[in-house]
């Protein structure tokens, strides 16, 4: 089961207060419901491929409203296709839609989120939970990028969802138009974690955070290893260059031509090619020399080698 499916399954087991029941159910019916007419009677059909969500809708309807509710399963004939679960409301469908602020008194569709539904903070949380159950998805935190989104057919409702998430919960949600509708989405791991907490998916939140911590630690270790590897490669490269330059000087004018201080460092570097500058400084006969002091002398040796390669004269009085 995917992380998104596990999260939704957890949400379908939450207990809700009567006021919150209405808010959650409004989002579920608004986003997954459709109207049908048979024999002059209107019915509401709510379709989902998730059995747990279908049971949730059925339970909320039976618990909160005096309406006739039926549950159907439509089996898809194609291979690897999930069943479709249909929750149908027949008697009382019109009054239910008005009660849930999905339609106005004249039966025109309300695309916005009615303030009556989300007066309390708990109801705001419940509406977002219903919206996520109806049209939400969230990436597995082990994947390359963090992403949570809620899909809506209508732009106005999508904007209202984004506004609810940002103005009351400061989630920094953004909206985007898709081919068949609109999405409100989150990309920041911290905000996704906050959203899971807001809608009551606490087990999913704990799993998300556990995976995120391990992932962030792994990334930090990788960055540290990469940095240390780069520094090591740089150090090895510098040592090889120094040895090459010292050997070139030895072959052209001889190391004995170098001033005593440079000659001593040159011989030490040839003898100890794999040691650090600090370790090299501790080998000097006259006493310990700092890392910067050793680096200065080696740079002077590099300059002498470059001048010799270029056929330029070398003034050893300026080489210290």
Swiss-Prot record:
GO terms for molecular function: DNA binding. Signal peptide: none annotated. GO terms for biological process: cell division; regulation of sporulation. Residues 276-310 bind DNA. Pfam families: HTH_WhiA, LAGLIDADG_WhiA, WhiA_N. Gene3D superfamilies: Homing endonucleases. Keywords: Cell cycle, Cell division, DNA-binding. InterPro entries: Homing_endonucl, Sporu_reg_WhiA_N_dom, Sporulation_regulator_WhiA, Sporulation_regulator_WhiA_C, WhiA_LAGLIDADG_dom. SUPFAM superfamilies: Homing endonucleases. Transmembrane segments: none annotated. It comes from the Bacteria. The keyword NADP does not apply. PANTHER family: CELL DIVISION PROTEIN WHIA-RELATED. Involved in cell division and chromosome segregation. HAMAP family: HTH_type_WhiA (MF_01420). Belongs to the WhiA family. This is Probable cell division protein WhiA. The lineage of its organism: Bacteria, Bacillati, Bacillota, Bacilli, Bacillales. The gene is whiA.
